[in-house]
From Swiss-Prot:
The keyword Transcription regulation does not apply. This is Required for respiratory growth protein 1, mitochondrial. It is found in: Mitochondrion. Coiled coil: none annotated. One of its GO terms (cellular component) is matrix side of mitochondrial inner membrane. The lineage of its organism: Eukaryota, Fungi, Dikarya, Ascomycota, Saccharomycotina.
Amino acid sequence: MTSHFSSLPAHRSYIFSLYRDVLRNIHRCCYSVELQNILTSKLNLTMKQQKGTMSSWKAHSKIKELEELNDRLINRDLPYLKELINNLSGNKINSTQPNQYVQDLKEATNLINEYHSNNSQSIETIKKMDILNRYIKTKQSKHLLPKEISNVYKESLLLPFAIHEDSIYKLNKLHNQLIRGPPRVRLTNTKAGKITIWFLRSALNKKDRQSKKLKLRIAKEKQKHQQRIDNIKTCEKYAYWALLEASWESLLNTGKLPTININKTINNLSTLDNEDININRKNNHHIKDIHVKEWIEPITYSIKQLVDKEFERKCHYENYKKIILYGKNNGLIDFFENKTKVMYARRVSRYKTVVNGLPFIIPTIPRRDLRTALLDNKVLLP
């Protein structure tokens, strides 16, 4: 029998990653809130509709559309988004009865597109203008520049010095980071109830470089823990009614009510401490009333299984910390420390290369300025 795409880990991982990227880029690259809402709702509707798709060709085409949408969002290709609003769900909007909401969106899109076509600037130019504006404001606040400056002087005279000063600031910032030594590798954790999930933090796996598997593992562990808590609460509710039924059955058969404290029994069953559970297991054998024992044993068994699973996961992460993270020769900690030292040595080498070339830096000559030296030596990202 043909397996569904959801049973393929590689497919699931890629789709989830791409889906998150598209959602992130919709809010990052679209300045219109209405456009964000339409794209988000259409995307969620399409993902829901195509969830049960078994056709490989159809799944392939939809993935390509999603990849194209992501690329268009990154490039801010606003005219294309108008067509993709219809294509994502596969349902064309009836042109004979156009939606007023869509018409307003088209007009807004045309205005935005017209504005960008008349005021198109590269990202590099925008960055340089931002540096220049900050430089001028700083100098004017110190009364080192006049309030009115010609645009010709700004671009031809002040811009090279603004970029040079900004590059010096970034070089000094890097120097302050390097004198502190290699970045630390530290052991940290997060909690899921009494389960302590241990993992490593270093300069190599922080922010965007953090392992997606680690995120999924933590989220899944917390979700499973909450499910066990909810199941135990459900067992408590059933235990209350089971004890009442057992008391009633015992009264019918023997004419006497069993001497049992319902609230105390439920509290003993629902505790999450494994040592207490072991004590309660011994106490459960002392329940003399056969009717109470018959009614309460299935619920007791279910709660024991849930608590044992909780304790098992707790031990699993403790062993993971001892064997994998520390382990022989410090395990993963030693591995990340070595990798971090190699990365630090490369950064020091690049920094020294830039510093050795400082006597030859001329801010006003293209390709001889400090910013170019930082970019060429990969000290500064473009």
